[in-house]
């Protein structure tokens, strides 16, 4: 991994937060105006490529893929979404999903992150820093709790974090292409999502250890979640899971959010 490319990519994502949504889209088109495939072939990029995530777009324009780099990932999943969808008209359910994804996206971008995929009623987000990812999760947790649905229920989501090496590569065919983030870092975060209650934030020990270096106050806010977990495809290791309480009334978490 070229450290210069990684630092430039991290700066690219944070640079977008200073732009208005319209300017950010146009800037993304400019940045991703050349698409570099794993075979080294270059293609003209249409405005649709504005949907290519920021850090990924940077790698596409600066070097061949695949490339392996360290990223923080955050999975966000709307809790109890089936109930909310089946109990209201599809158009109303769509508006809820749109509002949810808009909230998640705006907060991710404000914390130097970006969206890799919207997956059903959830999203896979990535960040150059685990501290940014954790603060984004807390901000999303607070924002979602502030607006009820039309039937009076509070909207809740589940959050899972991880940090580590991720391989970025192009998938698909010549007619339809996408970019994949592959590696145990992503898989473990996806598995952990099933072990957290609505509105909860869960992370493996790796995240807490990294936060101890980068954001100590935030690391101290995490609590060990019972005994370690044994999960499918991760049977060889006992995963120590940590949860982050809601910041309401917790001065240490509120301080960590602002630091």
Language-model features: locations:
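Alpha-helix/helix-capping structural signal
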Residues: 79, 165-166, 187, 206
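Intrinsically disordered, glycine/charged-rich C-terminal tails and inter-domain linkers
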Residues: 1-57, 198-259
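Catalytic NTP-binding/metal-coordinating core of nucleotidyl cyclase/transferase enzymes
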Residues: 59-132
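Alpha-helical scaffold within the catalytic cores of cyclic-nucleotide enzymes
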Residues: 97-112, 124-159, 163-165, 184-186, ...
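A conserved hydrophobic position in a structured secondary element of the catalytic/binding core
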Residues: 76, 128, 163, 202-203
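A residue-level structural signature of the nucleotidyltransferase/glycosyltransferase Rossmann-like core
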Residues: 73, 158-159, 200, 239
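Catalytic-core segments of nucleotide cyclases and related cyclic-nucleotide turnover enzymes
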Residues: 168-194
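Structured catalytic cores of enzymes that bind and process phosphorylated ligands/cofactors
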Residues: 58-59, 65, 79, 84, ...
């Amino acid at each position: 991994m070229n450290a210069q490319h990684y630092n430039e990519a991290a700066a690219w994502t944070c640079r977008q937060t200073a732009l208005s949504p319209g300017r950010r889209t146009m800037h993304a088109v400019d940045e991703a105006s050349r698409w570099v495939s794993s075979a080294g072939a270059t293609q003209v990029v249409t405005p649709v490529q504005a949907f290519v995530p920021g850090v990924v777009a940077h790698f596409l324009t600066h070097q061949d893929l695949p490339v392996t780099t360290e990223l923080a990932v955050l999975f966000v999943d709307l809790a109890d979404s089936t109930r909310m969808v089946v109990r209201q008209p599809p158009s109303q359910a769509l508006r809820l999903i749109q509002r949810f994804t808009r909230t998640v996206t705006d907060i991710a971008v404000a914390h130097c992150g970006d969206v890799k995929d919207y997956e059903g009623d959830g999203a896979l987000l990535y960040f150059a820093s685990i501290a940014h990812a954790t603060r984004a999760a807390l901000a999303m947790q607070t924002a979602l709790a502030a607006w009820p649905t039309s039937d009076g229920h509070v909207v809740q989501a589940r959050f899972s974090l991880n940090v580590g090496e991720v391989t970025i590569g192009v998938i698909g065919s010549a007619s339809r292409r996408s970019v994949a983030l592959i590696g145990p870092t992503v898989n473990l975060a996806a598995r952990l999502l099933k072990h957290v209650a609505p509105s909860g934030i869960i992370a493996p020990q790796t995240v807490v250890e990294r936060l101890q270096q980068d954001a100590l106050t935030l690391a101290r806010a995490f609590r060990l979640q019972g005994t370690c977990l044994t999960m499918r495809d991760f049977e060889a290791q006992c995963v120590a899971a940590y949860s982050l309480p809601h910041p309401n009334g917790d001065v240490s978490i509120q301080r960590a959010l602002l630091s």
